[in-house]
């Protein structure tokens, strides 16, 4: 005899939770908007305005993810209930097991959609940049910054965010002094925004012939790419623009011509750099985009200073604002804000950050 009631109760709960999400995400309005977007994208002249067409394409993906998932959950619950009935009528254990497995799949989809409620910020759906800066400590700190860069690149690849190296400055002996990476995809900023802060490494340094333990720091600053229609006034007189030859271990992703651009916003001290294109003009445009985005994020932080642990500028992220400790000799990585801890240090350094990120988002950081 099959244990039917637990499965039916689970399906009932899934349906109730799906209905709640239908209201939370305003399903009807999103479905109507999806139809409008599809109609616009079918117009033959839509690509006369490439930026608008790209924005519509991005909006369609976002809408389809919500509308499509709710449709799958709604229809899926009905289908599984029918499978259960067929299994009971035919006393078919294989069909019943299939129904149980399908119910588990639906629950996973539902949990993923419920988690999207964490992304309620104005720019959570945006692409984003991560600035990585090594702390004091010479080669050991610069090697740690490179490890952090690799960690985020791996995370981005695993989640389909197409990480793009915008700027990289080599360390004196090994590692890097700084890097900027762009993450492109839905909710990139929403996922990564709580990673801003200082990451602390404790290990026996491979650069110390005595094998002593060293403590190193690396700061991470995450900020969203903002739309061009958001008004951020930048006075050209406030800018210092430097052109230099690109350097860095970026391989084929970093060019070597004298087209790299560095822009300093003198009033705030904010510095942005770009060296990933052979065109100085394109690098300058990219720098201005980053500068605009960074100044906007800093302004948002300033307005919400009482609620956020972030400082007003990247350079003000002090070594006291540590968010995570990586103690490799003891095989322990701990988030100092949420208490989440793991001993699988290599997996984290290979980009397995979801446990930490999800906990920080759920705690409202």
Curated annotation (Swiss-Prot):
Location, primary (coarse class): cytoplasm
Post-translational modification: Methylated by PrmC. Methylation increases the termination efficiency of RF2.
Record bears the keyword Lipid biosynthesis: no
Modified residues (N5-methylglutamine): 252
Any one cellular-component term (Gene Ontology): cytoplasm
MF terms (GO), sorted A to Z: translation release factor activity, codon specific
Chain ranges passing through the membrane: none
Subcellular location: Cytoplasm
A Pfam family hit: RF-1
Keywords of the record: Cytoplasm, Methylation, Protein biosynthesis
UniProt family annotation: Belongs to the prokaryotic/mitochondrial release factor family.
Known role: Peptide chain release factor 2 directs the termination of translation in response to the peptide chain termination codons UGA and UAA.
Protein name: Peptide chain release factor 2
